C-alpha cells in the first residue's frame, strides 16, 4: 500500500515503456508535433501525506458557509429541509449504491421495487395515473414534458409563464431550439400568471401551457382558473410542482393537469452546490406510452409470485433508437431511492405536517416583515417563499447578513430586471422563530 494513490510509479512506467518498445515518454508521443504539445510546467504542488492533505482540505472546507453553521433563507429551487437519518443508511447499502439502470431486471428485484415505490408515491402526491422512474432534475423534466406535448399534439408552440423557474425556462428554450418549437412567455401580474395575457397567448397552434405551482415567487397559482384557458384548442396543461407542497395543496391532477413534473430535492436530497437532483415525471393514462425514461411495472411470475419489470421498453432509446420517445436514456435511481426513503420515513402525516410547517413559518415571516416596515412584493397565498423589496442591493444585504450568521435570500433582479433590489426569502421547517426574527430584524435595520 506504499503507493496506493499513484496510478503508476516510475518503475511501473519503465516496465510499460519496455513492453511497448519505447525508451522514454517523449519517444512514446513522438507522433505528436512539438508545436502542439504542452510545454509549460504543470505547477502541481509537491505531494503530501494523507494527514497533511486532510488538514489542508479541512482548512479549505472551513471557508464554506453551510446551512448547518448558518441559518439559510436561500431557496429559489433548492431548499434546506430535514433529512431523515435513515436515508443515508438506505442509499449507502452496496446493492443500491453501486447499481445502475437494471438491464437485467429479473436479478434486480430490490432495485426495481424501490423505483416502483417512488413512482407510486409520486402518483399519490400529484394525483396522476403514471409516473416514471425519475429524470435528471426538475428543469429537464419540464423540458421533456414540453417535447412530449409537442409530439402528442403535433403542434410547435409552447406557452410558459414567466413565473416558472428561470433556469427551467432556459432549459426549455435549449430543447425547443433544436426541435424548431416556438416558446412564448406570458408575464406575471402581482406574482402570479397574468390570466388575461395567457388567454391571448393560447391559440390552436399551442401544444402546451406550462405553469409552476407554487411558482418561482412562492405564490400559489390559481390552477382552477388556468386549466380551461390551457385546454383551449386541445393543448396540454403542464404543471411544475414542488412535491413537498403537494403534501398539503390540492394536487394538479385534481385540476385537470395532463403532465406534472418537478424536482424531488425536498425529499432526502441535500442542498449541494450543483446537485445532483432528481426530477419526477407523471402523466395521465392516455400519455402512458409517450413518457420518457424508465417505467417499472408490477407483475406475477408463472408461480403467482409478485415481481417487478421494466415495462413498455419499446418507447426507449436502447430498444428503438430511431423511434424513441426521448433521448434521455438514464435516470437518477439513487436519488429517487433517497426521496422514497425520506417520504417513507416521514409517512403521509409527516409529509403533510412538514408542508404545513413551511406554510405557517413562511406566513409568520411575511407578517413580521410587514410589521418591520419591509415592502412585501406580492399579495396572495404562498407556500414557503415570498419576496420583499429592499432599499439597497440584495448582494450588499446578503453580505451584511452573512456577517451575522445568516444566508440571505435570492436576488430576483438577476432573473427579473424589473424586480431589482427584491429578495426572495425561503422559510422551511428547519428555521426557528428566533432565526426568522433575527433575519427580519436585520433586514428592517438595513431598510431604515
Curated annotation (Swiss-Prot):
Record's keyword annotation contains Plastid: no
InterPro entries: GcvPA, GDC-P_N, GDC_P, PyrdxlP-dep_Trfase, PyrdxlP-dep_Trfase_major, PyrdxlP-dep_Trfase_small
Signal sequence annotation: none
Keyword Oxidoreductase found: yes
GO MF, one example: glycine dehydrogenase (decarboxylating) activity
EC code: 1.4.4.2
GO BP, one annotated term: nucleoside metabolic process
Known catalytic reactions: N(6)-[(R)-lipoyl]-L-lysyl-[glycine-cleavage complex H protein] + glycine + H(+) = N(6)-[(R)-S(8)-aminomethyldihydrolipoyl]-L-lysyl-[glycine-cleavage complex H protein] + CO2
Stretches of the chain forming a coiled coil according to its record: none
Keywords: Oxidoreductase
Protein role: The glycine cleavage system catalyzes the degradation of glycine. The P protein binds the alpha-amino group of glycine through its pyridoxal phosphate cofactor; CO(2) is released and the remaining methylamine moiety is then transferred to the lipoamide cofactor of the H protein.
Subunit structure: The glycine cleavage system is composed of four proteins: P, T, L and H. In this organism, the P 'protein' is a heterodimer of two subunits.
Entry similarity comment: Belongs to the GcvP family. N-terminal subunit subfamily.
Name assigned to this protein: Probable glycine dehydrogenase (decarboxylating) subunit 1
Amino acid at each position: 500500500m506504499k503507493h496506493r494513490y499513484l496510478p503508476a510509479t516510475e518503475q511501473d512506467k519503465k516496465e510499460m515503456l519496455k513492453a511497448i518498445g519505447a525508451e522514454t515518454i517523449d519517444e512514446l508521443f513522438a507522433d505528436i508535433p512539438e508545436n502542439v504539445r504542452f510545454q509549460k510546467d504543470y505547477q502541481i504542488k509537491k505531494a503530501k501525506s494523507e494527514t497533511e492533505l486532510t488538514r489542508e482540505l479541512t482548512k479549505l472546507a472551513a471557508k464554506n458557509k453551510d446551512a448547518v453553521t448558518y441559518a439559510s433563507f436561500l431557496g429559489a429551487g433548492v431548499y434546506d429541509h430535514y433529512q431523515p437519518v435513515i436515508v443515508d443508511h438506505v442509499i449507502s447499502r452496496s446493492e443500491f449504491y453501486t447499481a445502475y439502470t437494471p438491464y437485467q431486471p429479473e436479478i434486480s428485484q430490490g432495485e426495481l421495487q424501490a423505483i416502483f415505490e417512488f413512482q407510486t408515491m409520486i402518483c399519490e402526491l400529484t394525483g396522476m395515473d403514471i409516473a416514471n422512474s425519475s429524470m435528471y432534475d426538475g428543469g429537464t423534466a419540464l423540458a421533456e414534458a414540453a417535447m412530449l406535448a409537442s409530439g402528442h399534439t403535433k403542434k410547435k408552440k409552447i406557452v410558459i409563464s414567466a413565473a416558472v423557474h428561470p433556469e427551467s425556462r432556459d432549459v426549455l428554450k435549449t430543447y425547443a431550439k433544436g426541435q424548431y418549437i416556438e416558446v412564448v412567455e406570458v408575464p406575471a401580474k402581482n406574482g402570479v400568471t397574468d390570466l388575461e395575457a395567457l388567454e391571448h397567448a393560447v391559440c390552436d397552434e399551442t401544444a402546451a401551457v406550462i405553469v409552476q405551482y407554487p411558482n418561482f415567487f412562492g405564490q400559489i397559482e390559481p390552477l382552477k382558473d388556468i386549466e380551461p384557458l390551457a385546454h383551449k384548442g386541445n393543448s396540454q396543461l403542464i404543471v411544475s410542482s414542488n412535491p413537498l407542497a403537494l403534501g398539503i395543496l390540492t394536487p394538479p391532477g385534481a385540476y385537470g393537469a395532463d403532465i406534472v413534473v418537478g424536482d424531488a430535492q425536498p425529499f432526502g436530497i441535500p442542498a449541494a452546490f450543483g446537485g445532483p437532483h432528481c426530477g419526477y415525471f407523471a402523466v395521465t393514462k392516455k400519455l402512458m406510452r409517450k413518457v420518457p425514461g424508465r417505467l417499472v411495472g408490477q407483475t406475477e411470475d408463472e408461480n403467482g409470485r409478485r415481481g417487478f419489470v421494466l415495462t413498455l421498453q419499446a418507447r426507449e432509446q436502447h430498444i428503438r433508437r430511431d423511434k424513441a420517445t426521448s433521448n434521455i436514456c438514464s435516470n437518477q435511481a439513487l436519488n429517487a431511492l433517497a426521496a422514497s426513503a425520506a417520504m417513507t420515513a416521514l409517512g403521509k402525516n409527516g409529509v403533510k405536517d412538514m408542508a404545513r410547517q413551511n406554510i405557517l413559518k413562511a406566513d409568520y415571516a411575511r407578517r413580521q416583515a410587514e410589521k418591520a416596515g419591509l415592502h412585501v412584493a406580492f399579495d396572495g397565498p404562498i407556500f414557503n417563499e415570498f419576496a420583499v423589496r429592499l432599499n439597497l442591493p440584495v448582494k450588499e444585504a446578503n453580505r451584511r447578513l452573512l456577517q451575522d450568521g445568516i444566508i440571505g435570500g435570492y436576488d430576483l433582479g438577476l432573473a427579473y430586471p424589473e424586480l431589482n433590489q427584491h429578495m426572495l426569502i425561503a422559510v422551511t421547517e428547519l428555521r426557528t422563530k428566533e432565526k426568522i426574527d433575527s433575519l427580519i430584524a436585520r433586514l428592517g435595520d438595513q431598510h431604515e
